């Protein structure tokens, strides 16, 4: 048999998302999208030493005074009652683009590091209607129970070009390579870095 279910009556599933470390001024990370009948939105989360950065793109052809984007953060991912860290950018403060707008939101945070997990959600207001990424109950102001689980990952460094000899000895070329932190199992207490070089034929990893 067939049955219709109101999705807003179901308990929201918790989405796992990745937040890449931002390197320089270029925003490069995974894009996540969400929508309803009238609004389409997508965001790219990144992080740096000063906090969380979220680039949100909204397709909404009709301009209203209440149009806005809000990012909610639970720094400890407590998944419970909380007063979240939040930042809102109104449409009038955002960059206008064809068919909508683009908002860049900075959420100041400290002690961010690779493999740290935080809770976060994104809400888009289209006139008087809220469109939410994860918490479909719309209770982000008081609870992080249905925030998405966001894991901080290392950014992609620029890999230096160089050729080395594979003989168990560290060639001088490794001195110019950038050390890239490796993501260890979240329950592990150890950390590790690796250096990477490349030439026209090979990719070299020194760890």
Language-model region placement:
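Acidic/polar low-complexity flexible segments
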Residues: 1-26, 67-90, 111-171
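A generic structural motif
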Residues: 3, 54, 101-105, 203-205
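Intrinsic disorder/low-complexity segments
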Residues: 4, 8, 21, 42-43, ...
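Surface-exposed, glycine/proline- and aromatic-rich loop segments on solvent-exposed faces
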Residues: 31-90, 127-130, 176-207
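A short, structured loop/turn motif at beta-sheet edges
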Residues: 49, 109-115, 200
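Solvent-exposed residues in well-ordered beta-strands and their adjoining turns
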Residues: 57-59, 106-110, 125
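An exposed acidic His-Trp-rich patch
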Residues: 87-97, 101
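Localized edge beta-strand/strand-to-loop motifs within extracellular or lumenal beta-rich domains
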Residues: 97-113
């Amino acid at each position: 048999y067939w049955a219709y279910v109101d999705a807003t009556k179901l308990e929201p599933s918790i989405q796992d998302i990745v937040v890449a470390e931002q390197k320089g001024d270029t925003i490069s990370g995974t894009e996540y999208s969400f929508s309803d009948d009238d609004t389409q939105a997508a965001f790219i989360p990144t992080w740096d030493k000063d906090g969380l950065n979220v680039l949100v793109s909204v397709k909404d052809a009709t301009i209203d005074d209440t149009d806005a984007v809000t990012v909610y953060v639970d720094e400890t991912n407590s998944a419970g009652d909380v007063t979240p860290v939040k930042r809102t950018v109104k449409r009038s403060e955002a960059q206008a683009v064809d068919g909508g707008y683009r908002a860049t939101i900075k959420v100041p945070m400290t002690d961010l590091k690779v493999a740290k997990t935080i809770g976060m959600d994104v809400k888009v207001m289209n006139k008087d209607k809220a469109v939410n990424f994860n918490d479909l109950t719309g209770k982000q102001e008081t609870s992080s129970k249905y925030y998405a689980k966001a894991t901080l990952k290392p950014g992609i460094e620029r890999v230096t070009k160089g050729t080395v000899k594979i003989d168990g000895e560290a060639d001088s070329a490794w001195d110019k390579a950038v050390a890239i932190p490796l993501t260890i199992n979240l329950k592990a207490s150890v950390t590790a870095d690796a250096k990477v070089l490349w030439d026209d034929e090979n990719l070299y990893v020194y760890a």
